[in-house]
């Protein structure tokens, strides 16, 4: 099992090109199920999760290839509208095939999902939405089984804001009969990116980027070309690493507008941040100031950046209060950061971080995707050697992280 071996060795300096967003690429790949025509997707990150999704699509009969970050999808010969447990158990986003399959083929069997163990993250909102659109759904033997002659447009109000739920219902609505209105829709840039691809494929969607999406169903969608939006969480992770190490880095290929909440907090921590149309520069001239925040849905502070800012706060001056409102069980990295010398206490959905001048290297274990990233940041600023075990979590969401960090001066090795 692979591990990271990190020697803390001072500031990160240089340039990093940001990859396409995993959380946009996965639903966009599923959108290929909505048409028999060819869909070409650029800027697809080379990750465990994207490879798993392509494998899942192939299992259903789709022709799916990826070369140099470009995925070519051809869904004319799909013969098995089923997502089996062996793949779904490793990746929650597999649920995203449910809406497209039932919309185009009238049937779908999808195993209940797996992925990072950071809370319940129920799929009931997906199911309620599809039922409102006329699907008959049963859950038995660990599978969600959905059937519909043709989905019917409906007004769907989700009980909570759900990113994958919005994406699933949006894809389903494109081929439904009549008008579908999705109220309380997620506004994340990744949802917007999916919607923009669907429009290129012939979908009729109004309200893109808002919490109310209005979809006029069409009889068929056609092929299209699209480029996946940049990964704002990868960008935020590298910015936190630079801030923690008192570095000076430039990120390329990232529009700063999708990272507003993170950049505000980095400036509050004392960083100098400059931006252009598709680049961000961060310089941290002195030890960071502790910053408190509360996670919430976009455009507020993202839950996927909580762990990385906790690592930054661990070596900041002062005390920060972090409140996690999106997922339960998302403080599993606290114990591991404390092994490195951090001073963090967590109770319920709140953590209090009192910054210390130095961390010290130790062996630690990754517990989920973003927790892994926080341990990497901590390892970069710790005295001595840090070894991070179970980095397969990290490989699910970061494209060659060790190579990108090495290029800006980090001493980080992948070892077996």
From Swiss-Prot:
EC category name: transferase
EC number: 2.5.1.7
Involved pathway(s): Cell wall biogenesis; peptidoglycan biosynthesis
Gene Ontology biological-process entries: cell division; cell wall organization; peptidoglycan biosynthetic process; regulation of cell shape; UDP-N-acetylgalactosamine biosynthetic process
Keywords for this protein: Cell cycle, Cell division, Cell shape, Cell wall biogenesis/degradation, Cytoplasm, Peptidoglycan synthesis, Pyruvate, Transferase
Subcellular location: Cytoplasm
CDD domains: UdpNAET
Alphabetical list of SUPFAM superfamilies matching this protein: EPT/RTPC-like
Gene3D superfamilies noted in UniProt: Enolpyruvate transferase domain
Xref: InterPro entries: Enolpyruvate_Tfrase_dom (IPR001986), Enolpyruvate_Tfrase_sf (IPR036968), MurA_subfamily (IPR050068), RNA3'P_cycl/enolpyr_Trfase_a/b (IPR013792), UDP_GlcNAc_COvinyl_MurA (IPR005750)
Sequence positions bearing 2-(S-cysteinyl)pyruvic acid O-phosphothioketal: 116
Binding site for UDP-N-acetyl-alpha-D-glucosamine: 92, 121-125, 304, 326
NCBIfam families: murA (TIGR01072), PRK09369.1 (NF006873)
Function: Cell wall formation. Adds enolpyruvyl to UDP-N-acetylglucosamine.
Assigned protein family: Belongs to the EPSP synthase family. MurA subfamily.
Name of the protein this chain belongs to: UDP-N-acetylglucosamine 1-carboxyvinyltransferase
Organism: Cupriavidus metallidurans (strain ATCC 43123 / DSM 2839 / NBRC 102507 / CH34) (Ralstonia metallidurans)
Lineage, broadest ranks: Bacteria, Pseudomonadati, Pseudomonadota, Betaproteobacteria, Burkholderiales
Gene for this chain: murA
């Amino acid at each position: 099992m692979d591990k990271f071996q990190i020697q803390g060795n001072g500031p990160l300096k240089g340039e990093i090109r940001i990859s396409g967003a995993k959380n946009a690429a996965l639903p966009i790949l599923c959108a290929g199920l909505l048409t028999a025509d060819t869909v070409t997707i650029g800027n697809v990150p080379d990750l465990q999760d994207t490879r798993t999704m392509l494998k899942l699509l192939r299992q259903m009969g789709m022709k799916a290839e990826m070369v140099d970050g470009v995925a070519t999808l051809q869904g004319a010969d799909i013969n098995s509208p089923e997502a089996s447990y062996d793949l779904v158990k490793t990746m929650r986003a597999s649920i995203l095939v449910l809406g497209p399959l039932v919309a185009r083929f009238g049937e779908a069997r999808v195993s209940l999902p797996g992925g990072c163990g950071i809370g319940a993250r129920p799929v009931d909102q997906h199911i309620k939405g599809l039922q409102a659109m006329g699907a008959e759904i049963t859950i038995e033997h660990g599978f969600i089984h959905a059937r519909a002659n043709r989905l019917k447009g409906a007004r769907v109000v989700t009980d909570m804001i759900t990113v994958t739920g919005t994406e699933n219902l949006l894809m389903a609505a494109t081929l439904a009969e009549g008008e579908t209105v999705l109220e309380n829709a997620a506004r994340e840039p990744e949802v917007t990116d999916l919607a923009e691809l669907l429009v290129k494929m012939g979908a009729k969607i109004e309200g893109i980027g808002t919490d109310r999406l209005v979809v006029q169903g069409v009889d068929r969608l056609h092929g299209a070309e699209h480029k996946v939006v940049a990964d704002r969480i990868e960008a935020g992770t590298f910015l936190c690493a630079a801030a923690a190490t008192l570095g000076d880095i430039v990120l390329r290929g990232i529009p700063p507008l999708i990272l507003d909440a993170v950049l505000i907090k980095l400036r509050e921590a004392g960083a100098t941040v400059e931006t252009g149309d598709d680049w961000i520069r961060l310089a941290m001239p002195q030890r960071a100031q502790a910053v408190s925040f509360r996670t919430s849905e976009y455009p507020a502070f993202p839950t996927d950046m909580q762990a990385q800012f906790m690592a930054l706060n661990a070596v900041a001056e002062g005390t920060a209060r972090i409140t996690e409102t999106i997922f339960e069980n998302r403080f599993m990295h606290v114990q591991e950061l404390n092994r490195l010398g951090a001073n963090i206490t967590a109770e319920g959905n709140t953590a209090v971080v009192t910054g210390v001048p130095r961390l010290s290297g130790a062996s630690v274990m990754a517990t989920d995707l973003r927790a892994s990233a926080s341990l990497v940041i901590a390892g970069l600023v710790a005295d001595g050697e840090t070894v991070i075990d179970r980095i397969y979590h990290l490989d699910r969401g970061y494209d060659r992280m060790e190579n990108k960090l090495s290029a800006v001066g980090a001493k980080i090795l992948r070892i077996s």
